[in-house]
């Protein structure tokens, strides 16, 4: 089996406050293979975006990586100096954020921004970098790229700006792309186009993609595998088809049961009672136990570790008695 592009092992991220230390990420592990799209889904506050920021080394103080290891194609990157990590960002790891305006300088033409990024990571002349920029704009679906390359960010629609950001993310042909809610601010029809674009680029370039979103519809359309996060932990991870059609963790079951369907014989939508706990008030044992209809005494005391169950891994005591093995 080939080495994964991204390998995260027992990652812990903490934020220090005046009164206590809050653990936003609590011992998660996962891999992403070459050309694979891993969707990371969960409610607001589950730790999805913090996980992505930890991978690219952008956890701001008072936050810090408190434990665990992150590997990019075998190279450990969580302990690199800020300068070394800066060289990796953009060249080996591309980033797509929710609001494209935060990634684009409104005072510069998009061509200038693309050319600067390309020349930062490749030894190309100004003319060659401009030709590369035009090719990238065409690849991400910008019409008339020879003309639009001289446009400013405000002259593009939201969907077209996001395409420009994607072009920036792939201009150095990175091994990994972190896409954090890349379709949230877009119309539904534009969302579908961006989803298809990210999936195609990952396949065509062999790029690993970590897609962070709260939208299971986006995950189902785009991802090969999905990790369901809850209170800084991975509740369940597995092939997206298996997790959607046969979720194992009670929280994952609730998420899938809350997705509307057009089927005439569909069951009533599931409502998960309560809300995700604050970081300062995560209960002992399984963090989902106060909201879980299947919780028993062990759930309130002992943290469940991931158990491999078929193609999925689930962190739930309900599956301890099943024929399975503890996930590495």
Q: Positions of the model-derived regions?
A:
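A short, flexible loop at the N-terminus of ABC-type nucleotide-binding domains that lies
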Residues: 2-5, 14-27, 58-65, 81-84, ...
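Short catalytic/signature loops enriched in Gly
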Residues: 3-4, 143-147, 237-328
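P-loop NTP-binding/switch modules centered on Walker-like glycine-rich loops
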Residues: 43, 57, 83, 173, ...
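Conserved ABC transporter NBD signature motif
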Residues: 65-76
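Conserved ABC ATPase "signature" region
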Residues: 75-76, 128-147, 256-257
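Conserved ABC ATPase signature
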Residues: 151-156, 160
């Amino acid at each position: 089996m080939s080495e994964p592009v991204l390998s995260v092992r027992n990652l812990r991220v903490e934020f220090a406050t005046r009164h206590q230390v809050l653990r936003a990420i609590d011992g998660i592990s996962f891999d992403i293979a070459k050309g694979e799209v891993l969707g990371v889904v969960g409610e607001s506050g589950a730790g999805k975006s913090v996980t992505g920021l930890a991978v690219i080394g952008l956890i701001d103080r008072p936050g810090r990586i408190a434990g665990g290891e992150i590997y990019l194609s075998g190279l450990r990157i969580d302990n690199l100096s800020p300068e070394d990590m800066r060289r990796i960002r953009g060249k080996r790891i591309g980033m797509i954020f929710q609001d494209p305006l935060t990634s684009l300088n409104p005072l510069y033409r998009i061509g200038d921004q693309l050319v600067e990024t390309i020349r930062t990571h490749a030894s190309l002349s100004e003319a060659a970098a401009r030709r590369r920029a035009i090719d990238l704009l065409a690849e991400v679906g910008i019409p008339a790229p020879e003309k639009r390359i001289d446009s400013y960010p405000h002259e593009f629609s939201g969907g077209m700006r996001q395409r420009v950001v994607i072009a920036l993310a792939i201009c150095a042909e990175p091994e990994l792309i972190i896409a954090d809610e890349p379709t949230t601010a877009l119309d539904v029809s534009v969302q579908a186009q961006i989803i298809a674009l990210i999936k195609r680029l990952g396949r065509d370039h062999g790029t690993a993609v970590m897609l962070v979103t709260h939208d299971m519809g986006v995950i189902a359309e785009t991802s090969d595998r999905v990790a369901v996060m809850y209170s800084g932990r991975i509740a369940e991870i597995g092939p997206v088809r298996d997790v959607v059609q046969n979720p194992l963790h009670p929280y994952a079951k609730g998420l899938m049961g809350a997705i509307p369907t057009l089927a005439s014989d569909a069951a009533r939508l599931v409502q998960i009672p309560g809300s995700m706990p604050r970081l300062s008030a995560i209960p002992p044992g399984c963090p989902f136990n106060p909201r879980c209809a299947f919780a028993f005494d062990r759930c309130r005391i002992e943290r469940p570790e991931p158990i491999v169950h078929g193609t999925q891994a689930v962190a739930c005591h309900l599956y301890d008695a099943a024929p399975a093995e503890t996930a590495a």
